[in-house]
């Protein structure tokens, strides 16, 4: 399969690229690195990416920024960061990318455990991740030509525990390699409209 991986240079993206590149033709995409570059907050950038890459069998996203901060001091501009990046950025990939997928192709997006287990300073993250679950479940009902869509929802990554020190007290972590296997299930499997929870 020809697979485009957005966010390929991140912790999850690197693991997913390693897992999928053994069997497939992978195009690595990042904001500033990779075979191609894209800004998922820009419709023009996303459109240009797909026009350049052409038709693919799978679109994989391991991308999306969020805002972490206390609700008491949060501004709408802070909250908008996660909406524009992880939520609308990935929705944009799906809405645009569907037209570049071959029949029977797939879209795999990423959310996270905070959709179900809120944390302190994580209001934006919980909102965005929960919204992505709703989008994937609904989109699966309407995508044509046998196109599938699923969502990967991992707990905190083992590789990122120190980075998010204090945000996930008592949460068990999971290595990125385990998350990559959930991506394989989505890309190489047959199911659609699912949330693949990893580590919880």
Where do the language-model regions lie?
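C-terminal helical subdomain
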Residues: 144-147, 151-162, 166-200
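Substrate-binding pocket helix/loop in short-chain dehydrogenase/reductase
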Residues: 70-71, 78-80
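Conserved NAD(P)H cofactor-binding loop of Rossmann-fold oxidoreductase domains
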Residues: 60-69
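N-terminal Rossmann NAD(P)H-binding glycine-rich loop of SDR-like oxidoreductase domains
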Residues: 4-19
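Catalytic loop of short-chain dehydrogenase/reductase
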Residues: 82-83, 91-93, 106-132, 136-141, ...
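Rossmann-fold cofactor-recognition segment
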Residues: 29-45
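Conserved Rossmann-fold cofactor-binding substructure of NAD(P)-dependent oxidoreductases
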Residues: 40-56
């Amino acid at each position: 399969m020809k697979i485009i991986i957005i966010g390929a240079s991140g912790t999850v993206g690197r693991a997913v690229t390693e897992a999928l590149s053994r069997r497939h033709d992978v195009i690595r995409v990042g904001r500033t690195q990779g075979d191609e570059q894209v800004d998922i907050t820009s419709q023009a950038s996303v459109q240009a990416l797909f026009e350049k890459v052409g038709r693919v069998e799978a679109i994989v996203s391991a991308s999306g920024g969020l805002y972490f901060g206390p609700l008491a001091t949060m501004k709408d501009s802070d909250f908008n960061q996660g909406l524009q990046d992880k939520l609308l950025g990935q929705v944009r990939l799906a809405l645009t990318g569907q037209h570049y997928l071959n029949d029977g192709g797939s879209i795999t997006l990423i959310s996270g455990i905070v959709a179900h287990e809120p944390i302190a300073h994580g209001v934006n993250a919980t909102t965005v991740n929960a919204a992505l679950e709703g989008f994937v479940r609904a989109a699966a009902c309407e995508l044509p030509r046998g196109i599938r869509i699923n969502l990967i929802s991992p707990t905190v990554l083992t590789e990122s525990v120190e980075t998010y020190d204090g945000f996930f007290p008592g949460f068990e972590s999971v290595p990125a390699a385990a998350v990559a296997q959930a991506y394989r299930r989505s890309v190489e499997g047959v199911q659609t409209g699912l949330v693949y929870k990893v580590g919880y």
